Amino acid sequence: MGSYDRLTSLDASFLHLESIETPMHVGAVSIFEGEQFFDETGRFRLAEVRRLVSSRLHLIPRFRRRLMPVPLNQGRPIWVDDPRFDIAYHVRLTALPTPGNREQLMTLTSRIQSQLLDRSRPLWELWFVESLEEGRVALIQKTHHALVDGVSGVDVATVLLDFEPTPTYLQPPRWIIQPPPAQWRLLADSVWERATEPTEIIRTARAAVRGPQRALDETVRMIS
């Protein structure tokens, strides 16, 4: 196998079930006191927030990876490093009419969450919202189920941000982009995986003691 990881049957099912009417990402909204987010001139510290998030991306490697399909759809997609990863695309800033109230924030959140994530990029977005009443700042999180389940439901904001008055910028290791596998290798690996799926089915069934319903669902998907 190559140096990549493949979606599980469950994670891949989120992609298959997704449609414009049924988005398969999860969302959250948080509201914070705004003082720490603004500089002495009153401007939002967007560049600093992006730098802070960038310094922590190595803690969740998949947040710099995109989906890559298997040729001829002969298997589940894999995660590969995104060579055009752009932190500015994933960490954004918007604003409400001053002073924004909760109803306006929920309307904005609904609009953002109604849009599907771009599958050609890593499947997450963080939207900061300024101009809330009392000078507060909101954070709208948007992360695909296939990605969240793959990192065991990690609280993205807790890992990527630091809400202390003086945030800590980590010193991450240099990110070395790994090239995607050759198409022929990816196809060959998928064929081999399909040939060994009966073993995977047995393994999934044994896991039913820990999670009966989820294990059953995975087994059914692999058989069908």
What kind of feature is each model-predicted range?
Residues 1-12, 29-42, 50-224:
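Soluble acyl-CoA-dependent acyltransferase catalytic core bearing the H(X)4D motif
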Residues 9-21:
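Acidic, low-complexity proline/glycine-rich segments
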Residues 20-22, 116-117:
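A general structural signal for short secondary-structure junctions and capping/turn motifs
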Residues 21-25, 133:
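Short, flexible turn/loop "capping" segments at secondary-structure junctions
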